[in-house]
UniProtKB/Swiss-Prot annotation:
InterPro entries: PSI_PsaM, PSI_PsaM_sf
Membrane topology qualifier: Single-pass membrane protein
GO biological process: photosynthesis
Keyword Transmembrane helix: yes
Source species of the chain: Guillardia theta (Cryptophyte)
Residues that span the membrane, as ranges: 7-26
Record's GO cellular component terms: chloroplast thylakoid membrane; photosystem I
Keywords: Chloroplast, Membrane, Photosynthesis, Photosystem I, Plastid, Thylakoid, Transmembrane, Transmembrane helix
Gene name, Swiss-Prot/TrEMBL: psaM
Protein name: Photosystem I reaction center subunit XII
Family: Belongs to the PsaM family.
Length: 29
């Protein structure tokens, strides 16, 4: 069973990778 802390960490990692991808994408253009 997935705990709340694992969901919280997964959301933070997803948000971090999303922002990082946007910064890399905007820096390329």
């Amino acid at each position: 069973m997935i705990s709340d802390t694992q969901i919280f960490v997964a959301l933070i990692l997803a948000l971090f990778s999303f922002v990082l991808a946007i910064r890399l994408g905007t820096s390329l253009y």
